[in-house]
Amino acid sequence: MNNQRKKTGNPSFNMLKRARNRVSTGSQLAKRFSKGLLSGQGPMKLVMAFVAFLRFLAIPPTAGILKRWGSFKKNGAINVLRGFRKEISNMLNIMNRRRRSVTMILMLLPTALAFHLTTRGGEPTLIVSKQERGKSLLFKTSAGVNMCTLIAMDLGELCEDTMTYKCPRMTEAEPDDVDCWCNATDTWVTYGTCSQTGEHRRDKRSVALDPHVGLGLETRTETWMSSEGAWKQIQKVETWALRHPGFTVIGLFLAHAIGTSITQKGIIFILLMLVTPSMAMRCVGIGNRDFVEGLSGATWVDVVLEHGSCVTTMAKNKPTLDIELLKTEVTNPAVLRKLCIEAKISNTTTDSRCPTQGEATLVEEQDTNFVCRRTFVDRGWGNGCGLFGKGSLITCAKFKCVTKLEGKIVQYENLKYSVIVTVHTGDQHQVGNETTEHGTIATITPQAPTSEIQLTDYGALTLDCSPRTGLDFNRVVLLTMKKKSWLVHKQWFLDLPLPWTSGASTSQETWNRQDLLVTFKTAHAKKQEVVVLGSQEGAMHTALTGATEIQTSGTTTIFAGHLKCRLKMDKLTLKGVSYVMCTGSFKLEKEVAETQHGTVLVQVKYEGTDAPCKIPFSSQDEKGVTQNGRLITANPIVIDKEKPVNIEAEPPFGESYIVVGAGEKALKLSWFKKGSSIGKMFEATARGARRMAILGDTAWDFGSIGGVFTSVGKLIHQIFGTAYGVLFSGVSWTMKIGIGILLTWLGLNSRSTSLSMTCIAVGMVTLYLGVMVQADSGCVINWKGKELKCGS
């Protein structure tokens, strides 16, 4: 039997040595210390120092450190941080006093000189880029190596919009109200302020411009930003649609075929309808239209033409004429003043002085292209001054106007008027076209006020005009901004708070009051930012509300105004007077359409065989009695029976029948005209008074005694002429004079003052209108009939 003990595979565990070693190794201590510190354990100073270390290295703290940081008492933590600041300041002073070796400086200079170094007034100037923000900028000076620090927040890309100011020398004091400082000598610094896309800084504020409302001109031309144009276009669309139902249906069909949705179809139809009213008869499609009617034998007619209105003249045995003032042109107007509405600034420079060192100065202050401002700022140890107090500061920036507007003076001798005369022929193409193709244009200038135009088949018409616009150009300025123009009040234009320069043509413009478009920001110890306001074009458009808008084309300006003309019709002949009356029947081509002047348009086609002939046309009541209507188209005739004829007439108020033709074959059309004769009388009277107010000085001519009576007569006729015609339309010339004499006699013999004055006034007006007719009129004496025949 083998009694020997077997060897164990592993040594047995010593129970006496099972406890941990009481003295830790170095690695164990470091591991335990760092682990506790990361969890926030340890003395407060140690933990706060570790937090500062982590922040310098941009390492995020752990949750334990954040928890311990939140548990610190405020006063104790502040005392510890103040101690840190004191120690760091001592370290900085030690480093500043240490003399660097030449080898170390030579090693640092290539990396520090990433900027451009130049001089300004014998002092060093740094031109830095965006990458130098927060870096130490080192360069050699006579006083040694100068180290500058720049922490400007507006440091951007280099461009013409630069900022230049002086960095103060600071050694021991902490910087205060400065973003740049040096340790050896004062140094100028220049940098750009543009963004990466090259855009300049702008202030979005707009200048407070007084509106032009209430200072506009009293003309029929619509004003800027008014709703008149929109309403006129809507009325044109309505009239055109009712007059041309076939084209309206075609437009509806096209919109339905092109559009894919109800909204799209509606938009397309509206756009089509807004375009179509451009095809309209010359005077029929114009809302402001005046009728001037002369009697048999009239040889001349006085008319006053306005922009936006049309005059239709009628006289027996004379053709009906549509006359319109197309445009009033002025060439090469003199520039009164230029205003700047958009500018940019560059080369912003600031200089400052410490207290008791006098006023700050800049060379740019003497340059008229720079805008400058002086102020005072707080200075002291923290920004390079030995004394505390107010120091002088001046900032200048170069001003350049980018967009400007011009105010021009219009001179009478530079005016040129274009008048178009169209004969009412009844041609179907004339009705469907508003162009100048069917009219004849006459040109009137102050040098050539008389013009004779030839009207095909109707003879010659002589226009003898007085080239006076009725506008007082001493009070009116033609304002031009980009491609738009307005007529504005001169004093309003001169009072606009915008930078201005004279209208004289010079190689270099000198702007006054540039500060109106420039904003100087809050001034700091060594620097002041300057920004320019944005474009004022929108503010100007708003301020021009109520001004008369003008259309411009090239160098010629078209604007509102008046033109007084005498139409000499002695050479005019009426075509077709010798034709016989048509005996055949007529067919209505289109439904009778009403115009906006109370007249109707009738388009008929002749079915007879005796053309050419005159078309019988009349207005009758239910019993067949001819009523007092008016035929606008003089002597309507049929030349070619294959072509329709358009006839314009004015039926009486109420129910009536429009009769085209004669006998049993006549075409009889029922018509109802709204309104009343009395209402029309008051409306025409008010319109005449308004016309006299609009014409102003053009309605008066006090050059002689005869001129005085002519002007007074014109006033009476313009205001009371229509009312007189309605009240005494069926009274003979002798009876009119008798009524006027009777009323005047009653007034002279009345004991009541008010009744006497009323009777005398009414009697004199009645007597005057019965004997003489003025203004838009034509007169001739008929000795055989003992009557003075004039147009009304």
From Swiss-Prot:
A GO CC term assigned to this protein in UniProt: viral nucleocapsid
Region (Fusion peptide): 378-391
Positions bearing the site annotation: Cleavage: 100-101, 114-115, 205-206, 280-281, 775-776
GO molecular function, one term: structural molecule activity
Keywords: Capsid protein, Clathrin-mediated endocytosis of virus by host, Cleavage on pair of basic residues, Disulfide bond, Fusion of virus membrane with host endosomal membrane, Fusion of virus membrane with host membrane, Glycoprotein, Host cytoplasm, Host endoplasmic reticulum, Host membrane, Host nucleus, Host-virus interaction, Inhibition of host innate immune response by virus, Membrane, Secreted, Suppressor of RNA silencing, Transmembrane, Transmembrane helix, Viral attachment to host cell, Viral envelope protein, Viral immunoevasion, Viral nucleoprotein, Viral penetration into host cytoplasm, Virion, Virus endocytosis by host, Virus entry into host cell, Zinc
Extracellular topological domain: 120-242, 281-725, 776-792
Residue stretches in coiled coil: none
Region called Interaction with host EXOC1, residue ranges: 1-15
Signal sequence region: none
Glycosylation, residue list: 183, 347, 433
Propeptide: 101-114
Intrachain S-S bonds: 283-310, 340-401, 354-385, 372-396, 465-565, 582-613, 779-790
Name of the protein this chain belongs to: Genome polyprotein
Organism (species): Dengue virus type 1 (strain Thailand/AHF 82-80/1980) (DENV-1)
